[in-house]
A protein has these predicted regions:
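Feature captures the catalytic ectodomains and active-site-proximal regions of enzymes
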Residues: 1-374
């Protein structure tokens, strides 16, 4: 069963280096050939897949017209990895946010969005300082070092989160509360020589709760399109806007509860990842047997590889640092089709979500790249 290949599609991590290069920052070039700019912004619409946009083009005519080509987000196709790609210009094998949850040796399994233990909910900021988990220079720090103002325009609720600290250090944070001030603050930043990252989360939320393509999701997509139109209409001369996403989404129709599957628990000491993309951490010497068991039980419902094979296949990017390697499961399982690997007791909330993402399918991997110029 062949894993889909996207090598000829630009990576999400290339977008910000390309924008910084357009702003004249030395050494920055994402290979996207953007024109010289006075100010630039990347607007990330959480959960907006390329295929979803194509399927619902009538709900988003502005985005559809601007989005002439897709990006690939890399593995796993999840928010922590996508936000880190924006914040570093790198793939997960280098920035280290290898999942919604992943093991950090000596500290158990970290929930990267909440920065808490995925096992007992304890706060891990003290044990795992954000800038130690992700120590690489951020794109915002690189912009600021070149004398360009760097700003983040996002929900005020995210202003002091650990993930923000790990991936957006060096930026001035402009906390907003709704679509109106998201557009207004973005245009305010773009009025001077600056780089801006703006973020909208609610499309992803409604996709999880009601399903991607549901009526609620489509109504939100219409609001997103109006947001983009409002920013595009107000772009000052010399400004460039790039609208992207961190992942697509699928509706999960078949679930397997790992907690009720003894053959999938044998030799396993911990789980990371999420419903569509699992890190499986094994007992010493058990990896080969775990791979065999998971392949036997899951069959064509998932791609199952031992860590080194997943790395060699490029799942986590062209290179994986020694710092990041132990965070990747001894075994990695990526769901195909509309299948999900749930943990009904340990992850009750996640189990009951309608829409899911994380895997390697084109519905999850491909996102729009929409470019507008003032």
């Amino acid at each position: 069963m062949d894993v889909p290949q996207y090598a000829d599609v630009p990576h999400l991590g290339q977008v910000v280096p390309a924008l910084l290069g357009a702003l004249g920052v030395p050494g920055e070039d994402g290979g996207l050939a953007l024109p010289e700019a006075r100010s630039a912004c990347v607007l990330l619409i959480d959960g907006l897949g390329w295929e979803l946009l194509a399927q619902h083009a009538s709900d988003a005519p502005v985005l559809t017209e601007l989005a002439s080509s897709p990006l690939r987000v890399g593995f796993p196709s999840t928010t922590a990895a996508g936000v880190a790609a924006i914040g570093t210009g790198l793939a997960s094998g280098e920035h280290g946010m290898v999942g919604y949850t992943f093991e950090v040796p000596g500290n158990g399994v970290l929930n990267a969005l909440r920065w808490r233990s995925h096992d007992d909910g304890s706060d891990l900021r003290g044990a795992l300082p954000p800038r130690e988990v992700q120590p690489l220079p951020t794109t915002f720090e690189r912009a600021a070092a070149a004398g360009i103002e760097a700003a983040v325009v996002s929900s005020a609720h995210f202003a002091n989160t650990a993930l923000t600290q790990a991936t957006q250090s060096g930026a001035r944070y402009a906390g907003v509360h709704a679509l109106g001030d998201l557009a207004a603050r973005t245009l305010e930043v773009l009025s001077s020589r600056a780089f801006c990252y703006a973020y909208h989360s609610e499309l992803d939320l409604l996709g999880h709760v009601y399903g991607p393509g549901s009526t609620a999701w489509r109504m939100q997509l219409r609001h997103v399109d109006r947001l983009v139109e409002s920013i595009v209409d107000g772009l000052p001369a010399g400004a460039v806007l790039a609208v992207v996403a961190d992942h697509g989404m699928v509706t999960v129709e078949e679930k397997l509860n790992l907690e009720d599957s003894p053959e999938l628990l044998a030799g396993v000491r911990a789980f990371g990842g999420e419903v569509r993309a699992r890190h499986v951490y094994t007992e010493p010497g058990a990896t080969e047997d775990v791979v065999a068991a998971w392949r036997s039980v899951l069959g064509s419902r998932a791609w199952v590889l031992p860590r080194e094979e997943a790395i060699e296949a490029g799942w986590f990017g062209a290179s994986v640092s020694d710092r990041v390697r132990p965070r990747i499961g001894d075994v990695v399982a990526a769901a195909t089709g509309t299948f999900g690997m749930v943990r009904e007791l340990a992850e009750a909330v996640e189990t009951n979500l309608v829409g899911q993402h994380g895997s390697l399918t084109s519905a999850e991997q491909l996102v729009p790249l929409a470019i507008a110029r003032g």
